[in-house]
A protein has these predicted regions:
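Flexible "stalk/tail and boundary" regions
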Residues: 1-10, 14-15, 24-92, 100-164
Length: 164
């Protein structure tokens, strides 16, 4: 079964909570109800099962040693620390989006949002921002297809620079 796929419109309630649709709730409950919220640079809130987040953040063999010598690395740690928070899915299937995250991402109580599956988790998007992002994705796919078609139609025996 494919996990964390699809998209659904939801409402942020007056307390800043989002009720997860059954399909996403089932996916999260395969691990447990412990999730990590992370504000993404694209303008969405990523929600990841805790084990997935741990995998995403692995990679630096000695983070403390690197933090001692790298301003850039400390800034990266600061960004992740400030824009990330552990959370639990309630028994009612809701997640509370922290107020600072809502303000940063334009996710207001009473507002419709879009939940988008990403195969490793779910993103919460402001509906307008999601339309903009989806347009970017569609344009990228169109351009990629045009480049592939152009490459397929090139004259045999010529490389892509036009030389033989």
């Amino acid at each position: 079964m494919v996990r964390f796929c699809g998209q659904e419109a939801c409402l942020i309630d007056a307390n800043g909570r989002v009720k997860l649709p059954p399909r996403f709730l089932t996916d999260f409950r395969q691990d447990d109800e412990s999730v990590v919220l992370h504000c993404l640079p694209e303008g969405a809130l990523g929600i990841y099962p805790a084990p997935v987040w741990t995998q995403m953040r692995q990679g630096e063999a000695r983070p403390a040693a690197k933090a001692a010598t790298s301003i850039l690395f400390r800034r990266q740690l600061r960004r992740f620390g400030a824009l990330t928070q552990s959370e639990r899915i309630t028994n009612q299937g809701r997640i509370t989006v922290p107020n600072p995250f809502r303000e940063l991402l334009g996710l207001e109580p009473g507002q419709n949002v879009i939940l988008v599956g990403t195969e490793i988790g779910v993103e919460i998007w402001n509906a307008e921002r999601w339309q903009d992002e989806f347009q970017i994705l569609r344009e990228h796919e169109r351009r990629k297809a045009e480049l592939e078609m152009t490459a397929d139609l090139e004259t045999p025996g010529r490389d892509r620079s036009g030389t033989t």
